[in-house]
Amino acid sequence: MKKQVPRLSMEEMTPALQESLRPRVERLGYLGEFFQCAAHQPQALMSFMSFTEDLKEALPDNLTEVVALSVATLMGNAYERVQHERLSLKLGFSRDWVREVISSPGDGHLMSAPELAVQKLALAIIERRGHNTADELEAVVESIGHERAIAVLMLIGRYVTHALMVNCLELAPQVGSPLV
């Protein structure tokens, strides 16, 4: 595919964006191609990153990873799915749990009731474009409370946005899946 969007190196990015990305690059060991593209809008990218971090603070890791893995899988975003497979393992989740999240949407024996409710909501929102999801939302509110339910809704939107960009740009994972 022709790359319509030039990829920026760290050195080509604004100093503020370089500083913002440095910890992530050090943690991952590489500068992700998503960031190389999105860096053409440095302030928006930094806001996107801040939005992501705020939502990660609002939710426990297991729910964040359920949303990230579920949305990435349903949206066909291998780029993000592989990153979150790796992150989930680093956070201490088992390979079997990660496999269940990505292969058994809305059903499983390793996921907790709140995790299943969150996954069902995420899948329903995407599949139904947000319509007719009151039952799934109610289950999440009953399970984790309305404040966290709002964080889940926002996180779903964040990962859908990422997937749409990655899929349009035809970005591929820069590392292999740790599950193979």
Describe every region a protein language model picked out.
Residues M1-V180:
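Hydrophobic alpha-helical segments
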